[in-house]
Amino acid sequence: MAGTSETPISLLASDLSTYISDAASRPLPEAVRIKTKFHILDSLAAILSGSRLRAGLLGAAYVAPLDGAGPASVIGTNLRVPPESAALANGMAGHGDETDDSHLEGRFHPGCAIVPAALAIAERENIGGDDYIRAVALGYDIGARLTLSLGFARPDTSKHSTHSLAPAFGSAAAGAALFRFTPQQVRHVLSYAAQQASGIPFWQRDTQHVEKAFDFGGMGARNGVASASMVKAGFSAVEDPLSGKHNLFTAFGEDPRPEFLGEELGVRFEIMRASIKKWCVGSPIQAILDATTALIADHGITAADVRKITITMPDDRFHIVDNRTMPDICAQHLCALAIVDGGITFETTHDHARMHDSAVLAVRAKISLLPNAELTIARPARQAIVEIETGRGAFRHHARAVRGTPDNPMSAEEIEAKALDLVAPIIGKARGVQLVQAIRHLETLPSMRDLRPLLVA
């Protein structure tokens, strides 16, 4: 294929495209392979449960007119649509709420976009489980490094949304690997991903978790699949979108460090730094619930005991969860709910009616949520302190390493139990157990199409 640009190809673009080109053939370290399967299971469970939430229902309805026009499954339905459409619908379901995984350093939710994007192309190409696992791990590597290389500062000051940029490039890279593109074709995929790059963080004002689901999951998955599919169809592109005049970093970089995009590829696997949520709520609330439930368990605290609650959390994410109108991302509501019920479940965290429950509101009125700069720089990140004053005394818990993060990972049993709890109401417990077992041995699956009977509902 003839080059379409006279700009010399940078060493970064050359090395990165070669790495992506070889990814589907490159064995992963055993620990990386195992953890990737955990994130695939967690993401598929999030998509299945999200298929019954508003964002998931709307995504499926949007692509439903294309039923029968393509090979890719819309999870939780019987629809079969073009890959780009399946990626969009499944991506929106994957972030239909706050069940899906996250990556703290990369500041994005990788699984809700990369897992369905790679699945759509794997179904199209009839690709097996082992290659699929490698492509997903690659997507996490590229997505996280992309936002790190752009050098954004705090989440509350960034003008571009890392939660939209990273999924698009991660999904595009995964697709390029599954298509087994040459390095030149990979660079063309990255060029189309760069042209589609977008995302403004006013998703923080979304009150229905629909646009947010598109921004975090559906858009990046769709655009990544489209970027790879266009090159598969023969589209040519600029040879190096990472250097030269008007490149990715000059357009989106805040304090760009392009070298971060290729840093320690094949040595540091970003999926090992990704987190699986114990609680199906916004990431900044994980530590708050860890601390609250610990106090309930350790001291038998009930709603009747509470006189005052003080929650201290990092100031850079305070705005994301302070008195929000959606139950699963409102810190005050979830803390109060946990105390009233003695814990929380997926169902209670998504029950809008409980936001008007008089018992919950009574406890919530006693809560003060405080931003703290020291907790923002504390490591491990996203710590929280909950202090509860009762008639029996004052009790305090400082949650440092959030459950499900690399510093305090969930066990395989916990991850599989979470997934089963999420999918059983949709596909039944028996098929849920089959899905868990299939992902446990995913590298032996001859074709990702073989998962279809376990993902329809």
Residue positions per predicted region:
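Flexible glycine/proline-rich, aromatic-decorated loop/lid segments
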Residues: 192-201
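Active-site-proximal alpha-helical scaffold in enzymes
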Residues: 116-128, 166-184, 216-236
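Structural helix-adjacent loops and short alpha-helical linkers that scaffold large soluble proteins
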Residues: 124-136, 180-187, 237-240, 300, ...
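Acidic/polar active-site rim loop that often engages polyanionic ligands
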Residues: 169-171, 204-209
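Aromatic-lined, polymer-binding surfaces characteristic
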Residues: 142-169, 217
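Short helix-coil transition sites and intra-membrane helix breaks within transmembrane domains
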Residues: 104-111, 160-165, 200
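Terminal-appendage/accessory-domain detector
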Residues: 1-107, 208-225, 229-457
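Hydrophobic alpha-helical hairpins/lids featuring a short glycine-rich hinge
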Residues: 93-150
